[in-house]
Amino acid sequence: MEKIAETINGLQHIGLPTNDLEKTVAFYEGLGFSVALRTVNEAAGEQVAFLQLKELMIEAYQTGRAAGRAGAVDHIALDVADVDTLFVLLRDGGYELLDDAVRFLPFWARGVRFF
């Protein structure tokens, strides 16, 4: 069986909820980040901005649920070689997963698959 660590390539992005996406984008642009992608998460009805500085990517998204949490890290995404294999390894290894299957969002050219 493949080792879990062998499937992880590095950090993919950090998810950051915000009540004011434009203010958040302006803040990070002031730090030298550039907008790599602006899109909408249709399923959640949220505006999304991916902000990049060198190898660091932040996914900022406007949500009505950020009250009292603005600026808090919501998720950290790891870049993996095979998301399906890692999902099975973690599920079968007894890890508590939030999703029953790998999910998809139509971000970027090929989309984003996650769990």
PLM feature spans:
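Core segments of cupin and vicinal oxygen chelate
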Residues: E6-I8, L16-M57, T85, D92
